Structures are given as structure tokens and as C-alpha cells.
Amino acid sequence: MFEKGYVDENYVRIPKDELFSFVVRVLTKLGTPEEDAKIVADNLIMADLRGIESHGVQRLKRYVDGILSGGINLHPRIKIIREGPSYALLDGDEGFGQVVGYKAMKLAIEKARKTGIGIVAVRNSNHYGIAGYYALMAAEEGMIGISMTNSRPLVAPTGGVERILGTNPIALAAPTKGKPFLLDMATSVVPIGKLEVYRRKGEEIPEGWAINSKGEITRSVEEVFNGGSLLPLGGFGELLGGHKGYGLSLMVDILSGILSGGTWSKHVKNTNEKNSNVCHFFMAINIEHFTPLEEFKGRMSEMINEIKNSRKHPDFERIWIHGEKGFLTMETRLKLGIPIYKKVLDELNEIARRVGVKGLEV
């Protein structure tokens, strides 16, 4: 999504700091340590700032339910199970995925500073928000960052009709002379949160996103939520590369779940269930160990400019680079406020009443 500043009457704008404080209020009231609450809030707000509504504050109810059901451990003892100069294996002790992920990527960056590369695999965690958050942590330190996570089964494999794969996102960030390059994508056609957005709006989804329980392509959100499945990146069958998205999803499960000794998507549970056992994978690559950082940034910018200045299709205004829309949307929303769908605002204020904190005023 790229926002130029206009939103319709179904949205209200809320300043970033106000929304951040609200999330922290809710989480700390429920017993989350303030430092951890700020990490979770930062992750959610970054999603909304970048236009990723599916992973923004609309997800807060899921985390509140996870806390109240015992699915999220507010005081995890995050353990290093194995460690070497350039790698580590962590057990997240069912903590907030955002908190576990933040600490894991920090560790990967620290190791990359010393050895050139840092790899951290994580098991026994929870949903960690947007994958790009962690990849950008490395890019901001002048490194290449890679982040991925498995998730509960929502996607049918190519040729199947059963939910057996996760949406299993992948992110890679790299510094340039300007804003970082940021690829942040699900390995399904869309993440499940996109369907939740359409459900709230009462709209049909685009054709090609999902199938119903019989394996038929559907535009009905309810058919998807009632036994249907999302499709892997590339869509239905092999003609447009659905088997490639399927393969990328398995790659995430191998690096996140199987390598860590955790589990793969078929056996991952929802956030409000105990032992959801979400698994992550983080990598930081210290560019200076391979080539001078400024030279790398220059070459990145040169490549990007060549692509953006190449001949454009008449149906498109411009050629975008991954992450560019998100940074431009962030600039707009930092100035004007974050647009929140009114139904989401009602849900957030219901959460506030439920836990006993001040709600959001517009």
C-alpha cells in the first residue's frame, strides 16, 4: 500500500505517539514489563506506519487474548541452548514473538560484528509481527539482515486442499545511499491478516487468493475462514509458479522449525493456545567483511537507479523498489497520523474497557 494522504470516512487518523502509548498502556496493565511492551508496540506501530494494516494494531486483540489464555508468557526465561562465535539456538519460553525476535536479531548482529556473520535460530516462541522489522535492525547497523518465521497452517500445498503450510514470511534488508532496500513478503499470495481486513470491510477478496474447502477458487472470506485455505505465492497450480511459493514456504519451515529443533507449520498453534511453538530464523551479514560498506551502498543505489530508470510499461506510473512504498507511506503517516479503520478503533476501545485503561480519543 502507498498512501498519498487521503483516507475515506471509514477511517480516523491517530498520531503515532498516541497509538504507541495506548498499546503500551494495555500491555503493561496486563502485566507485560514496560520494556517488552514498548518492543511489541514499536513492531505493531511500524506495521501501521508502513501501510501493513494486517500486522498493525488490529492484531492487538490477538495478543491480549494470548496473554489472558496463557498462550503468551509475559516473563519468559529466554535461553541460549547452543552457541558458537557465529551462531546460536534460542528457546523463547513462549514469550512475545516480538520480544524474542528482537533479542535474537540483536544477538545475530553482535556476532556478525565479530565474525562477519551471525545466525540465530529460535524455537518455542509466538507470532513475531512483521518480518521486515528485524531485517531492518541489521540494515540500520550497516549489515544485510534476513528474517523469517513459520506460522500456523493456513495455506494448501500445490495440488492439495488442506491447510498444512504457514504463510511463512521472509524479509531481507540491505543499506543503500538512501532508504534501505526491504523485501518483506509472505510465501502465500497474501497473509491471513489481509483477509481479516476485507472481512471487517464486508468486501469480497480478489480472485486467486484462496480456495474453499472443496478446492474451488473463492472470493468469499467466510468460505476461506470456514475450512478454506490460502494459496501459495504464485497461486493455484504450477502454471504461474504456485509450486515455487510452496517451496519457499518449506524453506522457511526447514530453517526456522526443523533446524531449531522446534516444529513445522502443520503443528504450530494459534497465539491464544499454549505451546504454540512458533519458530524463527535470523541472519546478519557484516558487509565490511566482504566489501567496504560505502562501496556496497553505492553499488546498491546504482543498481536501484538503473531499475527505476528503465523503460516503463504504459499502464504504470513508475517502477517501485521493495520497501519504497512503505517508507513514503511512513513519511505521510508520521505527519498526518495513522489511519485506523473505525471498526478497529471500536475494537481497540473495547480492549481498553476490558482491561481497565484509558481508550483512544478522536
Curated annotation (Swiss-Prot):
GO BP: tricarboxylic acid cycle
**Which Gene Ontology cellular component terms are annotated?**
cytoplasm
Q: What InterPro entries has UniProt attached to this entry?
A: Mal/L-sulf/L-lact_DH-like_ah, Mal/L-sulf/L-lact_DH-like_NADP, Mal/L-sulfo/L-lacto_DH-like_sf, Malate/L-lactate_DH-like
Recite the UniProt keywords alphabetically.
Cytoplasm, NAD, Oxidoreductase, Tricarboxylic acid cycle
| Enzyme Commission code | 1.1.1.37
Any idea which GO molecular function terms this record carries?
L-malate dehydrogenase (NAD+) activity
Where does the protein end up? Cytoplasm
According to its UniProt record, which protein family does this protein belong to? Belongs to the LDH2/MDH2 oxidoreductase family.
Q: What is this protein called?
A: Malate dehydrogenase
Give the gene name. mdh
